Swiss-Prot record:
It is an enzyme of class 2 (transferase). It comes from the Bacteria. Pathway: Lipid metabolism; fatty acid reduction for biolumincescence. Belongs to the LuxD family. Gene3D superfamilies: alpha/beta hydrolase (3.40.50.1820). InterPro entries: AB_hydrolase_fold (IPR029058), LuxD (IPR003157). The active site is at residues 116, 213, 243. This is Acyl transferase. Its EC number is 2.3.1.-. The gene is luxD.
Amino acid sequence: MECSNSCLTIDHVIQLDDDKEIRVWETLPKDNTAVRNNTILIASGFARRMDHFAGLAEYLSSNGFHVIRYDSLHHVGLSSGDINEFTMSIGKDSLLIVIEWLKGRGVNKLGLIAASLSARIAYEISNDVDLSFLVTAVGVVNLRDTLERSLKYDYLQLEIEDLPEDLDFEGHNLGSKVFVRDCFKHNWVTLDSTKNKMKNLDIPFIAFTANDDDWVKKAEVLEMMNSISSTKCKLYSLIGSSHDLGENLVVLRNFYQSVTKAAISLDNDSVDLNVEIFEPKFEELTSVTVQERRLKNKIESEILELMN
């Protein structure tokens, strides 16, 4: 565990077999804030590190939440492995490991916030673990369609031996063969597979779509929502946003505000966003972002030293 006096982010390491490790960051609730019932776990989107969600963690902790973030195995970030070996199942296993680790530390009331591709993983596990609530933003529900839209070609139609070695996804080389094999073997691909996992969801759930999202169809998110038997779920739209929630400061602030309101509402067993929030100052958001980048760089330097 590591935290300097000037940095409020606490660094943890989950040690696994084969010398692998998952890095976890913890942000404690700010002093003199409302007491919340649940801890928040944030699952970052594909090609996003946990420090990319520094602002959201600051918003949530400024409104009383204990916040946990992590980097998946075989992904960008501080955990072990290379992104060209990433699969949806590895993402799922990483999330489950962190949830189990939190339970071992006495964190039993947990709300999950997941974005983009990690939302598809959240949909997969939400009925299998003891969550208090779920929030997703620009969550993928039809993996095949999203991949085709983002990559400009339906690579999943090809035979495994005909796939290119790597796929350039958001500037990162995704190992195509290992990823596609896993998609079909473990049934990650279709909208129906997502609906089947979510239809019996019985925890409060809020989903956010973006009205300019070219990667996720709002109609398919709505179809998934309508397949859920519970009435404790609601769909909202992030107006003016694309799939990239950080494309500009206006979109980013709307994302922070909306998700923080959702977390507070769900913490009170409601799916209505008619709550007030405290907003951190821009200078505070900038400061914590810079501090976390420094912490990330320090950890990366230490990892490189150990490898040499």
